[in-house]
Each structure stands twice: as structure tokens, then as C-alpha cells.
């Protein structure tokens, strides 16, 4: 079986109207959501699929640096292909990072060819399900957060993650109301997403310490990224206060930084997105280190159901004592609560994911286990431009976001807030 083509398709879902969300230091506007579907086509007619970063930068890297390397090569051993790639084009750090997403499609192909699920190619499953947390909650009133948490619990989830940042006192009121709404046996995660430090009007260190201490009263499962993600020493100091478990990792640039995060005593939960942070091999090495360190792992997943599925195939190869959680983004539909509509996220799969009492039941079919619906390629054409903007009160500026992880949050494109807001 030889690889004929490697394709990266950018997709977009535009919101009917821009969604404006107000936080402590300004306003966020969401215009659309983007995604990437990777296709690897072989001479046997089999096609492998993978999720990718929804950015032109990622597409250009795949098409110029990864596709030429893979085209014409036999697909029998993805690990051997990786070694050759890292000795050649993969010496470029950005291409090495992007290769992890394409590699998921290679495993999907190999699983289909051999008639086994991807999990059997990357260690072997030790369980058939993985615990999910419903992830939504973005910049609302405390009452709206509580209403959404109740709705997500009604969908069968037993955990809810929210993005806080509407002001310290309002954040605490939000957690109080959510805990009242869902009861004591429901897990809550608070994601500060480093935005507590965006602009001049931010949460200073003393405020963050006080919030962490107050959150302990409500039995919060973790506090995520309350500080700049590259400051591991600051995380270690906060963790030493032992108020609430601390989580971080989705912005680590490479494996070396991950190892420092794990070994420095900075966090209780390590997070990683397999689409944009090294793929299966990197995650497997980190899982071993996390297990030795007595920490826990939680997948970051902020895209489509295909990304959730790809992560789950890996997660079930490790016990829940190491790989505990998988993020499940909850987008809104006419009948369900969520952040905003993003129908592409579910429609990329022909069959819905099976969720039972808050656990994803991981399919045993060949490859990733669920067929991709290629009609999304025509139904959701790419729309160039940023998908979101942060309008910061002080200093007055707008920061555009081109994809969740295409560039560090503190290096986003900036322009004067006094300028007219750009169109997508």
C-alpha cells in the first residue's frame, strides 16, 4: 500500500451574526469556527483521515513540507516513517509539530488495512471507554452559566468546564450558583485560559491566590491556566499553596517544555492537544512520565468530533489512573445548550459518537472506527480571515485569533481599537 496524496482541506462555519461576549478586561467577538480535514489517499483506494489545525499556516506546512515526503512511500510502519521524517523535513520544529496530525491519518489507514482499531496499533486498549467533561461556558452572567451547566448535566455529562473571567467576585458567584444547580457529585473545572492576564485590567497574583483558595470551598476539580503558561515557576508556587488542583499544558511548544512542566511540580493535571502538539508518539512518552510522577492527564480537544475520537483511541490504551479525562466541546444546537453553533463539529462523522453516562464508548471498528462524511468539504467552504477578536479595554487594541494554536496568545496580531473592526 503506497501513499498517493496527502490533502489538507480547510473548512469554516460562519455564525449567522457575530457573537459578542463581555469579560473583565474587554470584549470578545466570535465570527466563525474553522477546522481542517486531512485526507491521505493510497493506491489501494483506502483513505485515512485526521483532524488538523484550522489555519492557512498549518495547511501550507502540510502541503509544502509533509506531503512531498510521504507521497510515493509504502505505508507499513508509521514509526519507521516518522524516524525518516524527523531525520529530514522534521528537523524543522514547525513541520515536526504538524506531522503528528497527519500521522493520525496514517494510523487510520493502517488500521483499516489490517482490520483493527487504531488503539491496537498504538499500545493496545486496556478499557473500552474514557471519561468526558462537557466543555462550554464562555463569558455569561452567573445565572446563565448555572443554566448551561444544568442543561449539560441533563445531556448525561457528569462534569462541566467553564471559561471564567467576568470579574473575581462574579466568578465566585458563578461557581456558587453552578454548584447549587448540579449538586455536590458533579465535577467542575474552571478554565482561566490565561486571559486573566490579558490587558492592564487583569487578575493580579494576589487575586488569583484568593480565587484559588475560595474555589476549594466548591470542590473544583481543577483550575486551568490561571497564569502565563510559560511561567512554570509561578505555577509551582501556586500549586504549593495547595488550594485546588492546577492544570496546564495546552500551550507547551514542545516535548522538552512538557517534561519541565511535569518534573517541576507545577501542576496536578497535564493537558495536551494531540492535533497540534506532537501526536500519538509524543503523548505516549509523556503518559509514561506523568504516571511515574503521580500526576494525571486530561486531553485538550477544542475542535470536531473527529478530534475527540482520535484522542480517545489513544486514551483507552492507558488506565484512568493516568489518562483520566477527555474534553468534549459542547456546541449549541436547536435542542441542546452550548457555547455557540458549530454543526460541522458533529457532521464530520457519519455516525454520532456514543456517550453513556458521561463516558465515550470507543468504537472497535477498523482505523478510527467511524466513517468520515466527506460532504462537509462542499457544505462548509473555507472563509479566510480570523475567526475571533479580543477587544481589550486597556491598552485599547484588538487582538485577532487565526486558530486556537497557530501562534502563542501573547503574539496575536494587534491593531488599534479605534480602527474599524475588520470583516472576516
What does each model-identified segment do?
Residues 60, 219, 230-247, 252-359, ...:
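Shared catalytic-loop signature of beta/alpha-barrel
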Amino acid at each position: 500500500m503506497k501513499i498517493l496524496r496527502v490533502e489538507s482541506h480547510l473548512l469554516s462555519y460562519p455564525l449567522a451574526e457575530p457573537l459578542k461576549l463581555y469579560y473583565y478586561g474587554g470584549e470578545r467577538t466570535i465570527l466563525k469556527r474553522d477546522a481542517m480535514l486531512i485526507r491521505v489517499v493510497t493506491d489501494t483506494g483506502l483513505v485515512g483521515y485526521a483532524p488538523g489545525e484550522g489555519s492557512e499556516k498549518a495547511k501550507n506546512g502540510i502541503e509544502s513540507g509533509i506531503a512531498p515526503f510521504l507521497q510515493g512511500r509504502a505505508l507499513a510502519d508509521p514509526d519507521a516513517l516518522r524516524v525518516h521524517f524527523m531525520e529530514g523535513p522534521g528537523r524543522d520544529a514547525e513541520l515536526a509539530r504538524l506531522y503528528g496530525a497527519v500521522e493520525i491519518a496514517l494510523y487510520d489507514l493502517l488500521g483499516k488495512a489490517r482490520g483493527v482499531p487504531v488503539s491496537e496499533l498504538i499500545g493496545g486498549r486496556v478499557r473500552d471507554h474514557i471519561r468526558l467533561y462537557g466543555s462550554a461556558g464562555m463569558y455569561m452572567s452567573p445565572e446563565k452559566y448555572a443554566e448551561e451547566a444544568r442543561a449539560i448535566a441533563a445531556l448525561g455529562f457528569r462534569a462541566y468546564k467553564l471559561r471564567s473571567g467576568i470579574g473575581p467576585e462574579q466568578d465566585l458567584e458563578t461557581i456558587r450558583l453552578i454548584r447549587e444547580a448540579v449538586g455536590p457529585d458533579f465535577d467542575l473545572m474552571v478554565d482561566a485560559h490565561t486571559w486573566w492576564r490579558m490587558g492592564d485590567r487583569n487578575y493580579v497574583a494576589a487575586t488569583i491566590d484568593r480565587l484559588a483558595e475560595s474555589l476549594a470551598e466548591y470542590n473544583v476539580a481543577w483550575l486551568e491556566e490561571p497564569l502565563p503558561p510559560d511561567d512554570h515557576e509561578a505555577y509551582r508556587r501556586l500549586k504549593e499553596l495547595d488550594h485546588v488542583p492546577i492544570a496546564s499544558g495546552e500551550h507547551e511548544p514542545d516535548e522538552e517544555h512538557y517534561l519541565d512542566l511535569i518534573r517541576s511540580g507545577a501542576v496536578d493535571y497535564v493537558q495536551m492537544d494531540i492535533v497540534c502538539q506532537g501526536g500519538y508518539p509524543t503523548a505516549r512518552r509523556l503518559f509514561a512520565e506523568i504516571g511515574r510522577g503521580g500526576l494525571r492527564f486530561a486531553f485538550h480537544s477544542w475542535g470536531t468530533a473527529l478530534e475527540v475520537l482520535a484522542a480517545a483511541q489513544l486514551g483507552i490504551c492507558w488506565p484512568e489512573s493516568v489518562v483520566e479525562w477527555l474534553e468534549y466541546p459542547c456546541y449549541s444546537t436547536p435542542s441542546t445548550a452550548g457555547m455557540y453553533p458549530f454543526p460541522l463539529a458533529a457532521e464530520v462523522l457519519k455516525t454520532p459518537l456514543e456517550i453513556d453516562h458521561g463516558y465515550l464508548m470507543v468504537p472497535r471498528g477498523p482505523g478510527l472506527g467511524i466513517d468520515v462524511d466527506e460532504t462537509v468539504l462542499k457544505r462548509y467552504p473555507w472563509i479566510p480571515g480570523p475567526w475571533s477578536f479580543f477587544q481589550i479595554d486597556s491598552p485599547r487594541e484588538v487582538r485577532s485569533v487565526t486558530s486556537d494554536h497557530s501562534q502563542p496568545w501573547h503574539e496575536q496580531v494587534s491593531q488599534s481599537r479605534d480602527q474599524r473592526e475588520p470583516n472576516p
